[in-house]
Amino acid sequence: MKVILLKDIKSVGKKGEVINVSDGYARNFLFPRKLAEEANNSNMRVLNLKKDAERKQKLQETEEAQKLANELKGKVLKLSAKAGENGRLFGAITSKDIAAEIKKQFNVDIDKKKVNSETIRKLGNYEIELKLYPEISTKINVLISEG
């Protein structure tokens, strides 16, 4: 019997896959636990519509991330921080601070998890990678000055 999986099932398949299983397994295990539904014409049509919508959504997100990457590429982010002797900062500049400053200076909202940097503890110029989408990233320069 062909079924459409509604959830990931170990050693069977992933959500959204159409697989062939025995009738007993489908009726006695998958259907009662709402892990799968029968792969009839109407359910297949709904599945195809969902997959098309997901594809369009992913394409749109990729385009937006690429546009954002082009917008931020090569920009210089200027931060000022208090520093002691030898240029060591009092405290540190984290990815959260960088994300907040990008929002403030460029009016672009970026999640702190997308800022790929270690904590900055000295004055200077740093190149930081922003991972905007799984395959799209860009680099910006961060200039830390005493202020």
Swiss-Prot record:
Pfam families: Ribosomal_L9_C, Ribosomal_L9_N
Source species, domain of life: Bacteria
InterPro entries (alphabetical): Ribosomal_bL9, Ribosomal_bL9/RNase_H1_N, Ribosomal_bL9_bac/chp, Ribosomal_bL9_C, Ribosomal_bL9_C_sf, Ribosomal_bL9_N, Ribosomal_bL9_N_sf
KW rRNA-binding (keyword) present: yes
Family that this chain belongs to: Belongs to the bacterial ribosomal protein bL9 family.
Main function: Binds to the 23S rRNA.
Protein name, as recorded: Large ribosomal subunit protein bL9
Species in which this protein is naturally found: Clostridium acetobutylicum (strain ATCC 824 / DSM 792 / JCM 1419 / IAM 19013 / LMG 5710 / NBRC 13948 / NRRL B-527 / VKM B-1787 / 2291 / W)
